[in-house]
């Protein structure tokens, strides 16, 4: 299976039990910042934004004072799982990022998708990739 099909079929798909509800954007990005696959709507990010995200995974809380920036959008960092998941909020939407051994799985959402639904979609794929040694 190609990385693009993971994005298309597992991240940008309808959310279970909520036909028509799906993430706004999604991507799988290597720890080095190289994009493995992304939805057409995933924002163009700057290397320093990805560096900040990786730093927060290695030193949890790093982004709390400044916020998480991706594609010029600032998200307020909310409770996550230290070293494993970063969650951010902006207005009626937000972002979930799951770290695997080699990649970061990104999901961006807006209402009517809920934070919990985004977390479920992103973390399920991230957990699967971890199980596969990725």
UniProtKB/Swiss-Prot annotation:
GO terms for cellular component: cell cortex; cytoskeleton. The variability of the residues taking part of IgE-binding epitopes might be responsible of the difference in cross-reactivity among olive pollen cultivars, and between distantly related pollen species, leading to a variable range of allergy reactions among atopic patients. This is Profilin-4. GO terms for molecular function: actin monomer binding. A motif (Involved in PIP2 interaction) lies at residues 84-100. It comes from Olea europaea. Occurs in many kinds of cells as a complex with monomeric actin in a 1:1 ratio. InterPro entries: PFN, PFN_euk, PFN_sf, Profilin_CS. SUPFAM superfamilies: Profilin (actin-binding protein) (SSF55770). It is found in: Cytoplasm, Cytoskeleton. Disulfide bonds join 13-118. Signal peptide: none annotated. The modification Phosphothreonine is found at residue 114. Binds to actin and affects the structure of the cytoskeleton. At high concentrations, profilin prevents the polymerization of actin, whereas it enhances it at low concentrations. It comes from the Eukaryota. Phosphorylated by MAP kinases. Belongs to the profilin family. The keyword Cytoplasm applies. Keywords: Actin-binding, Allergen, Cytoplasm, Cytoskeleton, Disulfide bond, Phosphoprotein.
């Amino acid at each position: 299976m190609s990385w693009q099909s993971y994005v298309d079929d597992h991240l940008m798909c309808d959310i279970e039990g909520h036909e028509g509800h799906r993430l706004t954007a999604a991507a799988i990005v290597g720890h080095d910042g190289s994009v493995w696959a992304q939805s057409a709507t995933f924002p163009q990010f700057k290397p320093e934004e990805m560096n900040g995200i990786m730093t927060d995974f290695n030193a949890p809380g790093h982004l709390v004072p400044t916020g998480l920036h991706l594609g010029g959008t600032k998200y307020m960092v909310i409770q996550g799982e230290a070293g494993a998941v970063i969650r951010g909020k902006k207005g009626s939407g937000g972002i979930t990022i799951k770290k695997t051994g080699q990649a970061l799985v990104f999901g961006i959402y807006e209402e009517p998708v809920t934070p919990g639904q985004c977390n479920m979609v992103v973390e399920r794929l991230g957990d699967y990739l971890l199980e596969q040694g990725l």
